[in-house]
Amino acid sequence: MQTYPEESLRLAAKDEADLEVVSALLQDAIIAGADMHYDAQHECFMAVANRFCWERPALADMNDSSGGAVHERALCGVRIDHVTAVQKRRWPADMRDAFLNLLALKLLAMPKQDSDYLIELSFSGGPSMRLTVKQIDIVLCDLD
């Protein structure tokens, strides 16, 4: 995993362990349907996520309506390269207007004879997206 020495988050994920870190950082991120795009010609999936800044401490002297800690949020660009196919399950009909809560990114098992990987994005309420990728190559970058 490569990190960059700035306050904003910049990560490159290249293996399953890196993917787990990316998943943790994107847990509970809100992604608008209009902010997700698969570019088949360039084999990449891109999204803009409004993520919790889990790596930073909770804001001091602030609580939410239930008394819980309040964390900062940041807009984060996500790019997954080497994507050869996208499958959507239980996807909202009005996707462009939908806002989805990302629960996790998971690496799923592929058939033994297949050298590709399958990355699943799971959202609350049941929707999911499966990306078939030739290799794990993900970049996260907080947007200014």
Task: Annotate each PLM feature.
Residues L143-D144:
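Glycine-rich, aromatic-bearing surface loops/beta-hairpins
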Residues M1-M46:
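Long, hydrophobic N-terminal alpha-helical segment
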Residues Q27-R79, T84-A85:
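Short, well-structured hydrophobic secondary-structure segments
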Residues M62-S66, M95-L103, I136-L140:
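General N-terminal targeting signals
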Residues L11, F52, L59-D61, A98, ...:
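Residue-level detector of solvent-exposed, low-hydrophobicity positions
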